[in-house]
UniProtKB/Swiss-Prot annotation:
GO molecular function: glutaconate CoA-transferase activity
Stored Pfam families: CoA_trans
UniProt keyword terms in alphabetical order: Cytoplasm, Transferase
GO terms for biological process, alphabetical: glutamate catabolic process via 2-hydroxyglutarate
Protein name, per record: Glutaconate CoA-transferase subunit B
Signal peptide: none
Pathway membership, UniProt: Amino-acid degradation; L-glutamate degradation via hydroxyglutarate pathway; crotonoyl-CoA from L-glutamate: step 3/5
Residue numbers annotated as active site: 54
Length: 266
């Protein structure tokens, strides 16, 4: 018999994402964990949120998680397919930035204490050890939107100084965005990792640990962070509702495209 109390950290991460989404918000997602989280939000926590996808799909309600942004499973359950897909992200972000309703998900290989994200390269830019796919739409999203950043919590990823700034966060603290001509009233709101939730101090704009998973601890988070991190405000999150874990496994991602279910939990 399936054990829905035996959850994985990725499932916890997806549920944590879902709980950050509110009714009335417009949510920009791609695929993977952010999409699973947004799908859970739409089904459970925020049925009146509106999911949009960078390929031009508006107000999506996927039954089963699509594998890519062009997957037909997206198109079967969406309110509108915008033909001008190349510019949709920037047009929508600019419009919704003014309405302050948009929340968007981005990720990367490295992040610094102010939420600047690198998804371009590791090492010297001109002679990199590793070259990634780059910004895609993430730079435009991070410029004009409030963002939730998805990361694996490892010391090599949480760095005091990242190798390249692909997507701007709070730059170097208060006023940093404005000095570069970026909107100062939007920026990274949360970092959701496989260990917990990190937020940004309103005054300093520096990251701090807000909450940690039952499977983690403040000490565990510190051990896997490459810069000084305030953990004094951190609280332990509740374990996810088994009914939501069942929903993820049986309806949203039954093929385990993005979340692998442990054998003992099947």
């Amino acid at each position: 018999m399936a054990d829905y109390t035996n959850y994985t950290n990725k499932e916890m991460q997806a549920v944590t994402i879902a709980k950050q989404i509110k009714n009335g918000q417009v949510v920009t997602v791609g695929t993977g964990l952010p999409l699973i989280g947004a799908s859970v939000a739409k089904r459970v926590y925020a049925p009146d949120c509106h999911i949009i996808v960078e390929s031009g799909l508006m107000d999506c309600s996927p039954v089963e998680v699509p594998r890519s942004v062009g997957d037909l499973r997206f198109m079967a359950h969406c309110g509108c397919i915008w033909p001008n897909v190349r510019f949709v992200g920037f047009e929508i972000n600019e419009y919704l930035h003014k309405a302050n309703r948009l929340i968007a998900f981005i990720g990367g290989a490295q992040i610094d204490p102010y939420g600047n994200v690198n998804s371009t390269s590791i090492g010297d830019y001109h002679h990199p050890k590793t070259r990634f796919t780059g910004s895609g739409g993430a730079n435009g999203i991070a410029t004009y939107s409030n963002t939730i950043i998805m990361m694996q919590h490892e010391k090599r990823r949480f760095m005091n100084k990242i190798d390249y700034v692909t997507s701007p966060g709070w730059i170097d603290g208060p006023g940093g965005r404005e000095r570069l001509g970026l909107p100062g009233d939007v920026g990274p709101q949360l970092v959701v990792t496989d260990k917990g939730i990190l937020k940004f101090d309103e005054k300093t704009k520096r990251m701090y640990l807000a909450a940690y998973y039952p499977t983690s601890s403040p000490e565990d988070v510190l051990e896997n962070t490459g810069f000084d991190l305030d953990v004094s405000k951190a609280v332990e999150l509740e374990a996810p509702d088994p009914a939501v874990i069942k929903l993820i496994r049986e309806e949203i991602d039954p093929g385990q495209a993005f979340i692998q279910v442990p054998t003992e939990a099947k």
